[in-house]
């Protein structure tokens, strides 16, 4: 039980700050062993010690898979889509199925999205029920992040946690990836900190990202230092002035030449003595040649 008692105090502080211990008002029968108590407002509190035990168990199961590409992370919930992609990137998993799960991905070999994983990890058994159901048909083990109201049917390992908050989901996926890397030997021991920040696993709203970008651009414009953005650099260099002056000179020269030439046909006829009507000239030459042939 040494490894179970070695939960760092910093991890406990992060779990509490991310509200990983806050469950829902409802509680499934098979989730009662993971509930610490029930508050006066009806919200169930999840036992963090039980969560740590299940997290270690899930990490050990993941490490037993020889080929990491045989593991698939699934998240139909938007708050977990960024987390599953980061988990697949850092642990070498085959891929992450985010957004909607395509029916038949595990059972219908005719579809292009057909896969044969040896293990799947889901964010929410309720939103990812299609993936869990298909995994049960082909005997694929399932690890799931389960809240107090999550159904545990066809779930082999349940990690009790709050699977509805953006911070709690990202933190649990980050801890799971860190523990997997430690068991594989990528990280020496628990005293060595992982260089990947937990913020990378958090969901980011696209609107908030756009607002941050706009605020940065406004700050650069206000400071008068546009070095951070190429698009904000005003093009007022000597090249533009030289190009404008050169272009103006060319236009002036062309206009003067046109005025000096005047009528092209008149000048052409005066200088060379050749009529400007090319069609009449060709007719006269043909008539002269025809008369010579008769003679």
UniProtKB/Swiss-Prot annotation:
Record GO terms (molecular function): structural constituent of ribosome
Compositionally biased intervals (Basic and acidic residues): 208-219
GO cellular component, as recorded: cytosolic small ribosomal subunit
Keyword field: Cytoplasm, Ribonucleoprotein, Ribosomal protein
SUPFAM superfamilies the record matches: Ribosomal protein S2
Chain intervals for the UniProt region annotation (Disordered): 208-231
InterPro entries named in the record: Ribosomal_uS2 (IPR001865), Ribosomal_uS2_C (IPR032281), Ribosomal_uS2_CS (IPR018130), Ribosomal_uS2_euk (IPR027498), Ribosomal_uS2_euk/arc (IPR005707), Ribosomal_uS2_flav_dom_sf (IPR023591)
Name of the molecule in the record: Small ribosomal subunit protein uS2
Record-linked Pfam families: 40S_SA_C (PF16122), Ribosomal_S2 (PF00318)
S-S pairs: none
UniProt subunit comment: Component of the small ribosomal subunit. Mature ribosomes consist of a small (40S) and a large (60S) subunit. The 40S subunit contains about 33 different proteins and 1 molecule of RNA (18S). The 60S subunit contains about 49 different proteins and 3 molecules of RNA (25S, 5.8S and 5S). Interacts with RPS21.
Compartment(s) of residence: Cytoplasm
Chief subcellular location: cytoplasm
Presence of keyword Lyase: no
GO aspect biological process, one term: translation
Similarity comment: Belongs to the universal ribosomal protein uS2 family.
UniProt function note: Required for the assembly and/or stability of the 40S ribosomal subunit. Required for the processing of the 20S rRNA-precursor to mature 18S rRNA in a late step of the maturation of 40S ribosomal subunits.
